[in-house]
Amino acid sequence: MQPAEFWKKDKIILYFFSALKYNPIINRKRKGTMIMKKWMAFLLAAAMVCMLFTGCGKSSGTDSDLAYVQDKGVLVVGITEYAPMDYRDENGQWTGFDAEFAQLFAEKLGVKCEFYLIADWTKKFVELDTKQIDVVWNGMTICDDALSNSSVSDPYVINAQVVVMKADAVGNYKTPESLSGLSVAVENGSVGQTAANAIAGAKVIPVGDQAAALLEVKSGAADACVIDITMAYAMTGEGTNYGDLAPGLKLTEEFYGVSFRKGSDMTAMLNEFMAELKENGTLQDMADRYKLTLAE
């Protein structure tokens, strides 16, 4: 509804109430009748307001999430620091498999790609629903929480939750039961946290993100961490900042997906675009560069 239109309708309502209040016929009725008339007036006014503003609760025929993004000219992509999916290069620019994928999709839509750092991963769907971001594109595991709170794309990368600890200790822990009594760092609200919670006797330590979970192990504040296997192999071992750490026991297998708002028409568009990139080999080339395994 346009502001001018709202003002006109607001003026009609005020006039209506004024007429009811000062109508001499109503004013000379008995007290009991006056009360009844006031209630009738209230109900009539309420009905009038409903009729006047029926159109306010309806869309103007542009419920399309795609149209919303194209109108503003930018796709805001929610991410965290998570190599090799999303991370900053030496120039401070966002790069990684997901960052490149998101930029290609933004080009397909004819809009700019803007990255937004999700400070609290547990609030990602709140950020999505309130339109702080348009999509969660950050190595997100397809799980019940994601399926309930968003529109999830087809799976595109195979992942697993893996236990990372000091390299010289990895061989001593080959079953979940063997981890009992250990302190295990996890990203708060992550699938890794769910996997760690299932380890009987483990002390689970929630932290801000997966990089922070690795740091807990490196510093000795935790015995182990549970993170995505994609990150574990990219961030640990010789030549990395975590050369003394290594991935060991695999706890779960899963798939990554991209989350849009519930009912978004961009989900189907991304699925079609993803199929094109798989067919022409673009997605496989990217997966090879980042040492990832594409979902079938």
Where are the regions a protein language model picked out?
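Acidic, polar ligand-binding/catalytic clefts
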Residues: 103, 107, 112-178, 244, ...
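Extracytoplasmic small-molecule ligand-binding "clamshell" domains
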Residues: 60-139
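Short helix-initiation/N-cap motifs at beta->coil->alpha
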Residues: 63, 115-126, 171, 188-191, ...
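A ligand-binding cleft/hinge motif common to bilobed small-molecule-binding domains
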Residues: 140-148, 195-198, 218-219, 223-252
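Periplasmic-binding protein-like
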Residues: 158-165, 229, 233-275, 293-296
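Ligand-binding clefts/hinges and TM-proximal coupling segments of bilobed small-molecule sensing domains
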Residues: 58-63, 191-208, 243-250, 272-296
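Short, low-complexity disordered leader/linker segments with a strong preference
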Residues: 1-72, 295-296
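Bilobed "Venus flytrap"/periplasmic-binding protein-like clamshell domains
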Residues: 76, 81-84, 94-108, 159-214, ...
